[in-house]
Amino acid sequence: MSLIVSPFAVIAASAAAVAGVLFLIYAALKSGHRDASLPPGPPTVPLFGNELQIPKADAHFQFMKWADEYGGTFSLKRFKNTTIVISDRKLIKELVDKKSNVYSHRPASLVSHLITHSDHLLVMQYGDTWRMLRKTVHQYFMEPNCEKEHWKVQEAEAKQMLYDFLTAPQDHMLHPKRYSNSITNSLVFGIRSKTVHDEYMERLFYLMEKWSLVQELGATPPVDDFWLLRVLPQWMTGHWRHRALEVENLMQSLYTTVLDQVRDRRARGINRDSFMDRVLDRLDKVPLTESQLRFLGGVLMEGGSDTSSSLILTIIQAMTKFPAVQARAHAEIDRVVGADRSPAWSDAAQLPYINCIIKEAHRWRPVSPLGVPHAVAQDDEINGMVLPKGATVVLNVWAMHHDPRRWPEPERFEPARFEEFPALAPTYAASGEWDKRDHYGYGAGRRICPGIHLAERNLIIGVAKLLWAFEFTQPVGSYSDIDPESGASQGFLHCPKEYGCGVRLRAPEKRDTIVREFQEAQEVFARFD
């Protein structure tokens, strides 16, 4: 039997094939194209858009150059994705703060989902679950609780930090990490980090390094915007899935272990009234899944440990490079506190220059130069430009903090810039006036860091005590790099690379004070034994 194919069928099949090819070509051209309604930006190429122009690390430097060229709001195309990069402080107030119901979402992220199962407060989508978890965190770390309860732990841990610097100055890169991690773990889990070699601390900072590298903008292929990247061999796409699953395993292991320790303690009848104790006490009223419990404790461990320690390390390094700043800080502290005690939180109002130093550290070396991306929940329009639903929104913190029109000589560490901002950061973040914001180190809008009150006190207490006790210098022949492009770690979180530092006790009589106060701190530490 012979088959006879109609000429019309051949023509129809050919036409369909041609149409299919033309559609694919059109889709490819459309994918990377920037619509005229979008904010301006660098020229695109078909299919890829601007993807090939975005650095795989430290993109904030290039983004600042583009901001100089295209303005405080520019757009990038990453295949079909639209990314809006904002360094216009007024616009951030108008959008992220005042339209928080539209700009509090996170971009869809397969990588984040693989790591956190969508249960991590930092990358969780905006909605009822996020609001419930955020409220739970806020209630424990709001300012009244910091003033009434948490400061005791902060003071005690800062006293140990002084003792650690006094007795082991060679570990200067580790002491601020132990300080911030122990405060966080004590308050969140009722578990101290007693030494710089604490297991949980070491595991946390190791996973944070991996997590930071995976989450950095440009470091992972845009697998959410071009499906083919999901199925290509891993060796062709930077092993993104393997890297994500490695972080997931590290997080699950650590956070499960710590939560299990809290439960074991409670099973023995010991309730330390930590954050996690209170959460477990209320599970009948606020039910959480096991995954939500693990990541709720985990996100607090991450945020509370990393930001404060990175900034303290930045400040110590700055003191070695800008001795006039350190001398002024010493003089201010000496006017308020003698050698018989170290500064306390109750002295903060009399130490305005210390507050300025902390603000300048946020500005000079922001821990997260591009923040955590937001997403647009619905089409929006600003200044005649369309910000489409689903677009990624990046707050260009680095550009705002290093704008020479706002901050002359931005690479100079000059705390006096902030003398017009005497209050703590939460005051200016809550201000309705965009030009009254001091810095963006804690984010913006409803996604602002929920531990902002605790973090401010960590920094003021820790830095004031350190500068009361010590003079920090750069030893002859040691290495200390403050170049922003080579002196900091890579990732979406930045910390100074290891640097040489001399630690000199400012007065012999302060040695006895440091030892005595460390002994007095044992009364607070006993609560966690």
UniProtKB/Swiss-Prot annotation:
Predominant cellular place of this UniProt entry's protein: endoplasmic reticulum
UniProt key word Membrane: yes
The protein's name: Cytochrome P450 monooxygenase acuD
PANTHER family: CYTOCHROME P450 MONOOXYGENASE ALNH-RELATED (PTHR46300:SF2), P450, PUTATIVE (EUROFUNG)-RELATED-RELATED (PTHR46300)
Enzymatic reactions: 3-hydroxybenzyl alcohol + reduced [NADPH--hemoprotein reductase] + O2 = gentisyl alcohol + oxidized [NADPH--hemoprotein reductase] + H2O + H(+)
Recorded GO MF terms: heme binding; iron ion binding; monooxygenase activity; oxidoreductase activity, acting on paired donors, with incorporation or reduction of molecular oxygen
Membrane-topology annotation of the record: Single-pass membrane protein
Pathway(s): Secondary metabolite biosynthesis
